[in-house]
């Protein structure tokens, strides 16, 4: 988390794993649909990309963006989860609550989302001031395809912490609901805060996908191309952005440029999403 410390609940226990990077890169440049399967679904969705994403969808009016409290200049320095639980419930009950949060984190890591949601709903009913509970519950709903519920919890996380750390996921929840004005507003917040290159990259991909969903492929391509150059030492977020950009080139009819970028991604990670299939399809 972008706050001081993380208590005994370590982020790696429940972070969305490398799969989320693949899911974001191969999904967020195309119209969204609810998801319940795992890697097999990722491969099949990617294989359908050309048929599903070639034509931009007809532009439509998006609901007006929510009125949000402006973010502070930097994320708030909040106490860790164990401190907040003990303040709310006392030492003994607070310790038990922390144990339940850790249990939910393990369930999330194991992709037992129903179990994680059940535990977290019990916790959030008792207290709504523990950021880790709101954050993890929002991620659980996101992975279950519960876009409205996920957005609700991640909006609460944003307001409580002043953090943009989950803005890409929150924006993706709104994109799934075709609330494009909210996607745009969150992208501006994330871009201006610029917390890290990986987070900004993920937010950029979601924002570009939302623009493309409205049939504005040229604008989406422009957003993905802005300040892009091939890095000498690519990291995972560079591969995600290159994949998304290549996908957008293909959708825009620029097959040679798409093939060039897909080939570059494959050269650095042959198992990234369905990139090998994408290269073959453009050969």
What is each PLM-predicted segment?
Residues 86-93, 121-128, 155-162, 189-197, ...:
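Solenoid-like repeat scaffolds
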């Amino acid at each position: 988390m972008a706050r001081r410390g993380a208590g005994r609940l370590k982020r790696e226990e429940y972070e969305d794993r490398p799969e989320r990077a693949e899911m974001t890169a191969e999904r967020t440049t195309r119209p969204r649909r609810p998801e319940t399967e795992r890697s097999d679904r990722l491969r099949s969705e990617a294989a359908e990309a050309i048929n599903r994403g070639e034509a931009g969808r007809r532009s439509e009016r998006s609901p007006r963006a929510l009125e949000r409290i402006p973010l502070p200049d930097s994320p708030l320095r909040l106490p860790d989860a164990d401190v907040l639980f003990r303040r709310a419930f006392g030492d003994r009950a607070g310790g038990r609550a922390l144990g339940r949060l850790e249990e939910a984190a393990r369930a999330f890591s194991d992709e037992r989302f129903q179990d994680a949601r059940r535990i977290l709903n019990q916790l959030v009913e008792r207290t709504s001031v523990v950021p880790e509970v709101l954050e993890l519950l929002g991620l659980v709903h996101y992975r279950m395809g519960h876009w409205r519920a996920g957005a609700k919890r991640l909006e609460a996380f944003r307001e409580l912490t002043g953090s943009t750390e989950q803005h890409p996921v929150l924006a993706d929840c709104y994109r799934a609901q075709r609330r494009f004005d909210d996607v745009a507003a969150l992208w501006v917040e994330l871009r201006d805060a610029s917390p890290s290159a990986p987070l900004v990259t993920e937010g950029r991909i979601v924002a570009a996908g939302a623009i493309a969903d409205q049939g504005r492929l040229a604008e989406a391509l422009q957003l993905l191309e802005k300040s892009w150059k091939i890095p000498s030492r690519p990291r995972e977020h560079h591969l995600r952005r290159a994949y998304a950009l290549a996908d957008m080139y293909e959708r825009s009819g620029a097959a040679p440029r798409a093939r060039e970028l897909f080939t570059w991604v494959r050269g650095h990670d042959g198992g990234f999403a369905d990139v090998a299939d994408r290269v073959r399809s453009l050969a």
